Structures are given as structure tokens and as C-alpha cells.
Amino acid sequence: MSGLQEARLRLARDRSARLMERAVRRMPGGVNSPVRAFRSVGGDPLFMERGEGPRIFDADGNAYIDYVMSYGPLLLGHAPPEVVGAVERAARRGTTFGAPTRLEVELAELVCEAVPSVEVVRMVNSGTEATMSAVRLARGYTGREKILKFDGNYHGHGDALLVSAGSGVATLGLPDSPGVTPGAARDTAVLPYNDLEAVRELFEERGEEFAAVILEPVAGNMGCIPPEEGFLEGLREITAACGALLIFDEVMTGFRVSRGGAQERYGVVPDLTCLGKVIGGGLPVGAYGGRREIMERVAPAGPVYQAGTLSGNPLAMSAGLATLRRTGEPGFYERLEELGARWERGMREAASGSAVPVTVNRVGSMVSLFFASGPVRDFASAAASDAELFKDFFWHMLSRGVYLAPSQYEAGFISLAHSEEEIDRTVEAAAEWFAGRRA
């Protein structure tokens, strides 16, 4: 029996099915973000009603241990009382003013204190806004036009960054979506992630043309893929030598893999940092920041324009402050590391002896399981993993009350609300699936 058949037998799904019928009439594909549509795994999506701690509950009353965690923001789990209380208090005072507030000052101070590269920060409303604005700022600051990104790194849906690699080692101007014009994409170069030598060769030839290199210091949008030893350090050296800015997109890793993000974990300080997800505590938010001399080029201090009606709104700032204050507690990240290590160890043990090829990647509380026989270090090796095996595994886990992202290219997330019990139940469910596929 396939995992999908198991799920259909075990799970009540009538209400979710009826909601999907209504949704497809009024929303493209029935969803407001493509991955939610379950296209990668087949079947229809589940509609969620509520969350509590490490669990979510769908419209039919099924409960799941959640490893999506809204794709990363919910570091404390679902509906933590301190965050809910902060948002309620803020809402009673007013949801938005279109004017500065104390809350945004306090969150800016906290971010600057925690993140090594950030001396000055601008709040926005999404990770896409943050990366678009950081790229514009890099171009305005350097007077150069070209940007280098890496294949499989996702930086939101801005036209200049919605670009993937084609044939050849370095490609320029290949849009990844209809509607992105060649003109919008032609100043973006793409190279394989973790290939420092390719970067070195490109910059030896044309480095003076590049305003910035932007990357996820830990890739999370092709599954969790860590930087190889020396990769981040090499990028720092190469960009500094030619006057290009190094931009870390830490929308996913900021306050997730350590309090100071991946830059603190790996000891490499970029020029600009993009943030989001965790810093909003589950509400829409983004931010970009960096050295004072660069950030002072942003309007109204400087000529590089960026603005937003709801930027720094009290609800998001309140949720962010309540979340980030918890991250400063003794043992916070040590606990997340313990839980992540338990998940990784358990998954390796569950898969041992199976005929199924498995690679497990983890950085802190970011995790991924690939159905691949060798190391997964870039987009090519991630894309070579077995999508059909993932689909069957996904539905089996769902039928056992474990909610994974419905795509093999999404990292999983462990929250502080997870416990050893949830991790062990997850491993047991995985072991059951692997047991049916012994060598």
C-alpha cells in the first residue's frame, strides 16, 4: 500500500476537501503560496485550523507533529503565550499608525546587538522586500550593476533574483518564470552553490562589474544544505578584494541556527544581512541591515529609495520582540541543538539497513532527509534525489501524524516546543516506513 493510500484510509479529510473546492474557485490553484498546493507530493492540501506548541490541527480534527513551522518563523512553536499576549496588547493600542513607534526602535536595537554585521537596520514586511532592497542598496552604494547568486538559493520573488542557472558554469540573464523579462534578469549571474573555484574564476575575469554576491549561508530552499568548509570565508575574501558587497540572506537562518545567525555560527561577517521569519514571531516581517556607512545611503538618510506603509507595524514588532527576547535566555540554542541532533541521529538509525539511499543534513534546528546515495551539497545533487520515494514517505508520515513540508526541496524546522517525545515518535514513524524497504 502506498503512503497516499495509507493517508486516505487513516485520515478524515472531508472538510479540507470541501474547502479546497471553494478555494480553487477564488484563488490561483486554491492557495496563496505555491508549495502549499501539494503539487510535489500529489493529492490535495490539508487546511489547518489551529496550532499549539509542536502540533497543528486540521479542519477535520487530525493532529500532527509539525516540522514545517510555517517554513521557519515559529522558533517557539505555535501560539506561545508570550507572543500571543504581546500581539493582543499591541492590537488594543492600535494596529498601525504610519508613524514611528517605540517598539520598532526596541526591535532594531535588539537585532543590532545580536547580529554581528548589523549596525543599522531597516524594517520591511517580507523577506522578498528585504532582498530586493538590499540588492538595490548594493548597486546604489557601489555604482555597479551585476549581482551573483547561487543555483538553488531562493531570495524571494523579485525579478532580478528569480533567476536560475542554465548551461555552462556561469550564466547571465535566464529568467526562471514567465513575466520576468530578459532585461530584468541579465545583470544576475548564477553559479553552483559551494563551488568557490567557479566564483574565483568569474571574479578574476569580471569582478569589477559586480555590486554584490548574495547567498543563503545555509541553503534552505533546496533542502537544508550547509556551506562547505572555506566556502563562506572564500566569498568574504573574494568580494572584499574587488570591492563587491557580500550579502547574507538570513531570512531563514537568522536567529535560527544561532542567535547571531549563520554569520555567528560560521564566523564570517557579511556587508549586508537580510532577515525575516523568526524576527516577526510568526507575523509578516522582513529587515535588511549592515554597516553604518552602507545603510546611511538608504532614504531618507541617503538617495537609495525604499518605503513601506506597514513597515515596522506594532503587531509584527511586538511578536518579534517577544520571540527574540526568549532567544537570549541561557541554554536556548543548546536545547535546539540537542533536539536537532536527536532527530538527525534517530533518522540515520531508522534508515540503517534499508535498501533506500538516504542522506541526512542538519544545521542546528534546520533538518533535511534526502533520498540520495551521496552527499547533497548543491542544487544538482539535491535535484538528483528520488522524488517518488519522498512522495511515498511524506504520505506515510502524514498518516502517522507527522507533518513534513510537501516538497523535498524545503528544509524542516524544529522548535523549542518540540520535546524528546515528539522527536522519538517521528523517528518511530520513519522507522516503520524504512522497515518495509529492507535490503
From Swiss-Prot:
The modification N6-(pyridoxal phosphate)lysine is found at K277. HAMAP family: HemL_aminotrans_3. Its cofactor is pyridoxal 5'-phosphate. Its EC number is 5.4.3.8. InterPro entries: 4pyrrol_synth_GluAld_NH2Trfase (IPR004639), Aminotrans_3 (IPR005814), Aminotrans_3_PPA_site (IPR049704), PyrdxlP-dep_Trfase (IPR015424), PyrdxlP-dep_Trfase_major (IPR015421), PyrdxlP-dep_Trfase_small (IPR015422). The keyword Protein biosynthesis does not apply. GO terms for molecular function: glutamate-1-semialdehyde 2,1-aminomutase activity; pyridoxal phosphate binding; transaminase activity. Its main location: cytoplasm. This is Glutamate-1-semialdehyde 2,1-aminomutase. Belongs to the class-III pyridoxal-phosphate-dependent aminotransferase family. HemL subfamily. Homodimer. GO terms for cellular component: cytoplasm. It catalyses: (S)-4-amino-5-oxopentanoate = 5-aminolevulinate. SUPFAM superfamilies: PLP-dependent transferases (SSF53383). Pathway: Porphyrin-containing compound metabolism; protoporphyrin-IX biosynthesis; 5-aminolevulinate from L-glutamyl-tRNA(Glu): step 2/2. It is found in: Cytoplasm. GO terms for biological process: protoporphyrinogen IX biosynthetic process. PANTHER family: GLUTAMATE-1-SEMIALDEHYDE 2,1-AMINOMUTASE, GLUTAMATE-1-SEMIALDEHYDE 2,1-AMINOMUTASE 1, CHLOROPLASTIC-RELATED. It holds the Pfam family Aminotran_3. Keywords: Cytoplasm, Isomerase, Porphyrin biosynthesis, Pyridoxal phosphate.
